[in-house]
Amino acid sequence: MEQEQDTPWILSTGHISTQKGEGGQQTPKLEHHNSTRLMDHCQKTMNQVVMPKQIVYWKQWLSLRNPILVFLKTRVLRQWRLFSKHEWTN
């Protein structure tokens, strides 16, 4: 049970209410400093999650060009072999 007390969502005793902003739009209003800590924790966690995803997307994007290059290389090699074979037999 003591380990659970270290997590921000267990420590948060405040609650989020809404306040009217400009244009009558309701926005969340944090009423406890632990709620602010929870929001900061969530933001940091999201940032840690987003970065590896961006790296994965870049790797996928970079690997997209490789199959195309491999396809072109094999196609050219096949045509070259066919051409060479054809020249050899004639």
Swiss-Prot record:
GO terms for cellular component: host cell cytosol; host cell mitochondrial inner membrane; host cell nucleus; membrane. It holds the Pfam family PB1-F2. Residues 1-30 are annotated as: Disordered. Residues 65-87 are annotated as: Mitochondrial targeting sequence. Residues 14-28 have a biased composition (Polar residues). The record marks N66 as: Low pathogenicity. InterPro entries: Flu_proapoptotic_PB1-F2. GO terms for biological process: symbiont-mediated perturbation of host apoptosis; symbiont-mediated suppression of host cytoplasmic pattern recognition receptor signaling pathway via inhibition of MAVS activity. The keyword Membrane applies. Keywords: Apoptosis, Host cytoplasm, Host membrane, Host mitochondrion, Host mitochondrion inner membrane, Host nucleus, Host-virus interaction, Inhibition of host innate immune response by virus, Inhibition of host MAVS by virus, Inhibition of host RLR pathway by virus, Membrane, Modulation of host cell apoptosis by virus, Viral immunoevasion. It is found in: Host mitochondrion inner membrane; Host nucleus; Host cytoplasm, Host cytosol. Its main location: host cell. Belongs to the influenza viruses PB1-F2 family. HAMAP family: INFV_PB1F2 (MF_04064). Is not encoded in all strains, and seems to be dispensable for replication. Plays an important role in promoting lung pathology in both primary viral infection and secondary bacterial infection. Promotes alteration of mitochondrial morphology, dissipation of mitochondrial membrane potential, and cell death. Alternatively, inhibits the production of interferon in the infected cell at the level of host mitochondrial antiviral signaling MAVS. Its level of expression differs greatly depending on which cell type is infected, in a manner that is independent of the levels of expression of other viral proteins. Monocytic cells are more affected than epithelial cells. Oligomer. Interacts with human SLC25A6/ANT3 and VDAC1. Interacts with host MAVS. This is Protein PB1-F2. It comes from Influenza A virus (strain A/Hickox/1940 H1N1). The gene is PB1.
